[in-house]
Amino acid sequence: MGSSSFYRVLLLVGFCAPIFCMLSSNPYNQESSHLPSMKKNPASQVSPSNTRFSFLLYQRLAQENPGQNILFSPVSISTSLAMLSLGARSATKTQILRTLGFNFTWVSEPTIHMGFEYLVRSLNKCHQGRELRMGSVLFIRKELQLQATFLDRVKKLYGAKVFSEDFSNAATAQAQINSYVEKETKGKVVDVIQDLDSQTAMVLVNHIFFKANWTQPFSTANTNKSFPFLLSKGTTVHVPMMHQTESFAFGVDKELGCSILQMDYRGDAVAFFVLPGKGKMRQLEKSLSARRLRKWSRSLQKRWIKVFIPKFSISASYNLETILPKMGIRDAFNSNADFSGITKTHFLQVSKAAHKAVLDVSEEGTEAAAATTTKLIVRSRDTPSSIIAFKEPFLILLLDKNTESVLFLGKVENPRKM
């Protein structure tokens, strides 16, 4: 085939299957060893940019999907795009890395990829009480001649697996890729590809799977089977509502008029549930930033609190090829694309960037002893100092403490809508 051959790149970005508090036993036998502090490890070079990108992408998704559940994995999408940038050249590369929030004046390209290398290894490290697995895989057209440097770097830096695929038989290739993703997400994400064609040159898949236990699980006996949840459009649906009275980190952002609840998972992960005041969801969404998240993290105080959180399962799918160009990644999706770092024998451009996430939240989990050095006001368990009920639309953020990465970010508009 000559240099004028045109092939498509299919980017399946971050197919996510987070399952919160569902484990009844620990999948690992040993705690992970202590990781270096963020000031000393390479992930500190990429995590701040990843967080900024997280909120910018959320704001774009919320703007284009009003009144809908929002759910995605920022760290997975960032990792996919950073890996793709290894094969990009000229403006194509610059647009990808700048949209991810990197300023070449402050951080070099090798440092960026070294940071992602550490990030991927850290997130995949075994932790007692949680299972988090993130991986990348490239399905390559069998006759495509790839640059050896690109293959070496995606394997070394991002731990990517590489498979040769016969895309001339699109139906068979599609079935094999779908089967792979379904297996890696333990059946949570199915049929991710539905429109594969024979002009495909490469399919890049990034998948992430998460299971964890609450350190303070809910009792199923306390779940109200039918609790009213007020949707933003004014109608009401009835959902199972979990509740418990415990010591949690809690605070109120008076500037935004929202309440923030932090719930910890075993294995160095935390969840933030953010409840806006009446009519203030849009204001909250516009104000999301890395600085705001740091402010919340530092200001929360431990207190006895009665918590009501719906039990729910939601999912969301996005065609990011319509979103990312609006954020600055333009050339990758048009005839100006330069992926000559992947192959010099064919012209490549990204034809599709798909993302799907599935989220389950329930009561079940393994009980664990609470150990904290945070200052605690001693109160009777029967007289909680505060009550917070997530009976209206709210935001949820899941963070990995070791890398300070936003693993999942979403908005629950309707707990009953998958």
Curated annotation (Swiss-Prot):
Residues with attached carbohydrate: N103, N213, N224
GO CC entries: extracellular space
Keywords: Glycoprotein, Protease inhibitor, Secreted, Serine protease inhibitor, Signal
Single GO molecular function: serine-type endopeptidase inhibitor activity
Signal peptide: 1-25
Cellular localisation: Secreted
Highest taxon, organism lineage: Eukaryota
Family, similarity comment: Belongs to the serpin family.
The protein, known as: Serpin A9
